[in-house]
Design a protein with these regions (language model features):
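Mixed-charge, low-complexity intrinsically disordered regions
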Residues: 1-497, 574-635
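Envelope-exposed proteins and targeting segments
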Residues: 3, 216, 305, 514-516, ...
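Beta-sandwich interaction modules
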Residues: 488-494, 542-562
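Noncatalytic modules at the cell exterior or secretory-pathway interfaces
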Residues: 495-505, 559-575
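Solvent-exposed residues in well-ordered beta-strands and their adjoining turns
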Residues: 506-508, 521, 571-573, 592
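Extended, low-complexity, turn-rich repeat/linker tracts enriched in Gly/Pro/Ser/Thr and Asp/Glu
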Residues: 508-514, 575-579
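Surface-exposed beta-strand/loop patches in noncatalytic accessory domains
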Residues: 513-550
Length: 635
């Protein structure tokens, strides 16, 4: 039930619209009115609201998961990372909640029983707390009330402070624990990230045309150079592009001071401040750029450049350049991170690549947090190309981001510039897709399939070969090696069909050898096929034991043999080695038509093996180059 009173300061009508409301800010004179039953106390004036790019308004109604709510109050809270708008909402069923806005992100949180929670000093960024689905601590600090508007169900005063811990849980869950000024939790708010559309407030963005505070022009107090603040309601640091001075911005530019006169720009940004880029179907504006590095000393540091992009509805993202390679980086929900030697996120497994201390060396443009030159964070990168998962932590914060590798040509197209204007690529990037990896598996499958086909063809051909002549050649008694008496000439035999002709000889050799000078002659034409064959088998023993080598078998292949009647002529020579007394008396001869040659099959297999082997080698070399830059080089 609403309750109307007159403002003790200006006399204007002030309405407490909700029974639970304790304080109300007079919209006319900004007096803070405290309600105690029917008595109204004037607690003094509160400061004017700091201009922010929020699209929300008091009295605006929306709905979440089917339940309607109304925005009844706002608290502007100073956090270490900047100013937050925290809107108090009242649901139609009597529940209360908060709609928190910071750096373009919104979280809807409901009041819940804090239950058994760890003490404030036990909440460490990057670690999970017991209970509450093992949510991860992502931010701890002290919050300060700057100013208020509307009505609130708790007695808050400007300047009031409290300890807090922000948590992230699975499936987008988010929570804030309020510890008051001590160690024990006094309140907890649980919910998740939400867009204007999910809150039933999508019309605000459309009606406002994504309105934001106009850019403001000012002068650098050091060099008097002209500066433009594109986000005057959010920016906390501005680095002069002319002299490098880092400026601290208080509120909405009521004061500017030189924060670091030594911030000399050590790199040439690839894009001008204010440049626009069309990425993923959205137009982003370059707000700032910084160079960061890691390494054991100033002489052995590894540097890269990060460009801060902004879009009024989607907030912020980074475009990172590292040795001519580019990644688009967005904030990721740390509550969905599965820890371990490897990381699991978004259904993907990420392998550890490198851990380091990342330091801010130089910067230009504006930033929505109090960045400083020399600022150091503990960083770790995990990769699943083309994705890279990055963790950065300090004593008070844990940030998770997900990057995606993009080609230089796509970056150039996004900014409408020529690709050669961008830094030239060097080496292999941690998240760069391996151009060969997707081809290795299919190529080996292709090799196995084709090999199987060739083997089947070979075996099928072998079963279709046939013997056209076979005999045992007996040497005449007393015949001398190489003499005309030892020459063998067969009876005529028919060779039909097509294909090659194989002549195969087997002799029972023992420390002896056999050489044959052969001729396959057509009896009705002058076509003659000449060939030579040699077999030898040797054995013995030495200090290493018994040994043997060679064989009593020899083969010769003849090609281009047309069908017809043929005779086989063999002129043998033979001999023994050492003290062998075995005398060669005979040998066997076989002539077959259409015998596939295993050597041809082997050559074919080697040739088709070369392509997948080369691609595999290139893929392996690419991965070797990638991991040579990691903490696991050589492992």
């Amino acid at each position: 039930m609403s309750y109307e009173v007159s403002c003790p300061s200006c006399g204007s009508a002030v309405i407490f619209a909700f029974d639970a409301s304790i304080i109300r800010v007079c919209s006319s004179c900004r007096s803070l009115l405290v309600r105690d039953g029917a008595r109204i106390e004037n607690a003094g004036l509160v400061a004017e609201l700091v201009s922010t790019p929020s699209l929300l308004l008091l009295g605006e109604t929306g709905s979440y998961q089917g339940d309607s709510f109304q925005i009844v109050g706002r608290v502007q809270v100073e956090h270490p990372a900047g100013l937050w708008d925290e809107w108090r909402i009242a649901f139609s069923d009597g529940r209360l909640g908060w709609l928190a806005e910071s750096l373009g992100r919104r979280h809807l949180l409901l009041d819940v029983d804090p239950g058994d929670l760890p003490a404030f000093s036990q909440c460490r960024p990057g670690e999970r707390i017991r209970g509450r689905s093992a949510m991860m601590v992502i931010d701890v600090g002290v919050a300060t009330v700057k100013t208020l508007e509307g009505e609130l169900p708790q007695d808050l005063r400007p300047g009031e402070t409290w300890n807090y811990a922000d948590l992230a849980g699975p499936k987008g869950a988010f929570a804030t624990i309020d510890f008051g000024d001590g160690e024990a939790a006094r309140a907890m708010y649980l919910g998740r990230a939400a867009t204007l559309e999910q809150l039933g407030l999508g019309h605000l963005g459309r009606e406002a045309g994504f309105a934001k505070a106009a850019a403001k022009a000012l002068q650098c107090p050091e060099c008097r150079g002209a500066l433009t603040l594109r986000l005057p309601d959010l920016s906390k640091r501005v680095a002069c592009p002319y002299c490098g001075t880092l400026l601290a911005v208080e509120g909405s530019l009521q004061a500017i001071e030189a924060a670091d006169k030594q911030n000399k720009l050590s790199f040439e940004p690839a894009f001008k401040l204010g440049a626009k880029a069309r990425l993923d179907g959205v137009t982003w504006v370059v707000l700032g750029a910084m160079e960061r590095s890691s390494g054991p000393s100033d002489y052995t540091r590894y540097s890269w450049r990060e460009y801060l992009l902004h879009e009024p509805i989607r907030g912020f993202r980074w475009l990172v350049e590292d040795r001519g390679h580019w990644t688009v980086v967005d904030n990721a929900h740390a509550g969905d991170l599965e820890m371990g030697t490897k990381r699991r996120f978004g259904g993907q497994t990420f392998r550890h690549f490198v851990s380091s201390e990342a330091r801010v060396d130089s910067l230009v443009g504006e930033f929505p947090w109090a960045v400083t030159r020399g600022e150091i964070t503990q960083a770790a990168d995990y990769i699943a190309p083309p994705l890279i998962l990055s963790e950065e932590s300090t004593a008070t914060e844990f940030n998770l981001s997900l990057g995606r590798y993009i080609e230089s040509a796509d970056v150039a197209q996004a900014f409408g510039i020529a690709a050669p204007a961008l830094p030239r690529k060097e080496g292999v990037h941690a998240a760069q897709p391996n151009p060969y990896q997707g081809r290795v598996g299919p190529l080996w499958l292709w090799f196995l399939a084709l090999s199987a086909v060739l083997v089947v063809i070979f075996l099928f051909s072998a079963t279709r070969s046939r013997t056209v002549f076979q005999t045992t050649v007996r040497l005449p008694p007393g015949a001398v090696s190489g003499s005309p008496q030892a020459v063998f000439i067969s009876e005529p035999f028919q060779v039909t069909g097509s294909g090659n002709v194989r002549v195969k000889v087997y002799a029972p050799l023992d420390n002896s050898w056999l050489y044959l000078d052969g001729t396959l002659a057509n009896t009705k034409a002058e076509a003659v096929g000449d060939f030579e064959m040699e077999a030898g088998f040797y054995r013995g023993a030495d200090q290493d034991g018994a040994w043997s080598e060679g064989s009593g078998e020899a083969v010769a292949f003849l090609g281009g043999v047309p069908p017809g009647e043929y005779t086989l002529r063999l002129a043998p020579q033979w001999g023994v080695v050492g003290r062998s007394k075995r005398v060669l008396k005979d040998f066997q001869v076989e002539v077959r038509r259409g015998v596939p040659r295993a050597s041809y099959l082997l050559i074919a297999l080697v040739l088709i093996f070369l392509w997948p082997a080369w691609v595999t080698s290139r893929s392996s070399s690419f991965e070797t180059a990638r991991w040579s830059e990691s903490d696991h080089a050589g492992s």
